[in-house]
Amino acid sequence: MVEKQITQSLNRTVFPKILRNKEQKENTVVFAYILLFSLFLLRIMMLSKEERNMNKEGVKIVTIGGGSSYTPELMEGFIKRYDELPIREIWLCDIEDGKEKLEIVGKMAQRMWDASPYDVKVHLTLDRREALPGADFVTTQFRVGLLNARIKDERIPFSYGMLGQETNGAGGMFKALRTIPVILSIVEDMKELCPDAWLINFTNPSGMVTESVMKYGKWDKVIGLCNVPVGAMMDEPKTIGKTLDQLTYKFAGLNHFHWHKVYDEHGHEVTKDIINAMYEGKDMGIPANIHDIPFFKEQLLRMNMIPCGYHRYYYREEEMLAHGLKEYNDPNVGTRGQQVQQTEHELFELYKDPNLDHKPEQLAKRGGAHYSDAACETIASIYANKLSHIVVTTKNNGAVPDLPVDCAVEVSSYIGSTGARPIAFGPLEPAERGWVQCMKNMELCVEEAAVTGDYGTLLQAFIINPQIVAGTKAKRIMDELLIAHKKYLPQFADTIARLEEEGVTIKDDVARELTEKGL
C-alpha cells in the first residue's frame, strides 16, 4: 500500500516535470531504475521483524501435544515442504502424563528427519515455556485428560440413551470446557515469549477453541484446522472423473458443521454430480470415525450442497444414535474412544521400532488423519505468502452473512503472510441458516461457560444443543460429567463441590471407575 502511494505521488509530481524538460528525458530510464531499487529497499525495510528473522535463520516450530500419534504425519508434511518452509528446529512439548509417548514419538520424529536430506534437530520438553521463546509457529494438538476423558465424554451420555461423541453433543461441549482454559494459558505464554508467532490450532473442538483464542485470548494470529474438508477434497473429485486441480471448492459453516459446493474448470457447478456419485457406492472421504449411513438423497439435491460427514449425527440422528448405543452396549467393541485406545496402542508399538523412519499406513485408522498435512500446508502458505486455497476456521468478516461478522466460521480461504482471507459464500437457505445459527449460539454459550465457570450458562448450552433431549436426564448428564472431569474443571470447583454434597454419582461403571482412579 505504501509503495503504491509513493508511485502514484511520483506519477503526479516528479515524472511530469522530468518529461517536460527535453534535456532530461534521457535521465528518465535511469531515474526509473533508481526508483524501483528504492521501492525494493523500502519493502525490505517494511518486513516485519518476524519475517526478517524467519527468512534469515529458518523457521522454529513448536508443537504442543507433541506426544500425539499424529506427530509423524506432521513431520512428513514438513519434510515434504522443506524447500518452501526451511525449518531450523522443532520442539515437541507435552505434559508429565504424556512423557512416555513423547519420548517414543520424539525418537521416531528424529529418525524421519535423519532419513531425509535435511539437518533438523527435534527437541523434547515437558515445559512449553522452555520451547516457546523465538517460535515462529506454534501448533496445538493436545487432549486435556487424554483418551480416558474422551471415554467418559462418550459413556456418560450413552448411559442415558443420548449421543456420546468426541466433538458433538454433551461430550463435545465438555471437551471444550476442559480445553479452552488451557489454550488461553498457552496464549498468555505466547504473548510473553513469542509475541510474533502464529498459532495453528487443530485441538478439538477446533472451532470453539479457535474462537476462544480470538475472543477471550485477544490473539488474532490464529488459524483453526480440520481434516474433514481435506478428506472430502482428496476423494470426491475422482467420483466424477476429475482431479482436485480441475475443481474449485467453496465451504461454509462451522467446524464439523459445514457444507460445500463444487465447480469444474469451466466454472460449471458439479455439486449434484458428486451427490449422485454418493449413491453409487464411491468413496467420499468420510472420516474413519464416522459410521457411514447415507444421507437422504432428496434432501441433498434440494439443498444443492454437500454436508460434512458429521452432519450424519443431525440429519440421521436416530440411526447414528442406535449405532453408537449398539457399540456402547457391546463389551467387545465399546465406544469410539475405547476403540481408539487400542489403535493408539498398536501405533505406539510400531513407533518403538528403531528401524521405522516413515509414517505407517495404520495411522489412517485414526479419525483425524490429514489434520497434520493441512497444518503444514497452512504454515508453508503463511511463510511463503503462497495464497493457497485452504479450508480453515477464521473470523467470519461477512463470508457467511447469516452469522455475526466477528464470530469464527469454517470457510474456504486464501492463506498468505497476513493470515486467512475468507472467501465469501453468500446467504444460506432457511433450513441450513436455522441449523448454523442454532449451533453457533450453542458454541458461544459453551465458550462463555468455559471461561466463567457459570453453571446456568452451561445449562443453556445443553438445552439448545440439538443432540441433547432437554429435561431432567440432560441436567443429570451434565452434573455427572462435571464430577467426572473435576480434575480438569477448576472453574466449576464450587458447583462440583455442591454436586458432591448432594450425592451425585456416575451411573456408567467404566466412567465411574476411571473417575475413582483419578483418570
Go through the PLM ranges and name each one:
Residues F137-P157:
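Short, solvent-exposed beta-strand-terminating loops
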Residues K152-C194, W198-K215:
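Rossmann-fold NAD(P)-binding glycine/threonine-rich loop
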Residues D83-S116:
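Glycine-rich phosphate-binding loop and adjoining beta1-alpha1-beta2 segment
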Residues K60-P86, I90-C93:
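N-terminal Rossmann-like dinucleotide-binding module
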Residues G241-L519:
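Long, compositionally biased stretches enriched for glycine and/or charged residues
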Residues V30-R43:
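Hydrophobic alpha-helical signal peptides and transmembrane signal-/tail-anchor segments
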Residues R111-D136, V144, L163-G169, T179-C194:
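A structured beta-alpha segment of the ubiquitous adenosine-cofactor-binding alpha/beta core
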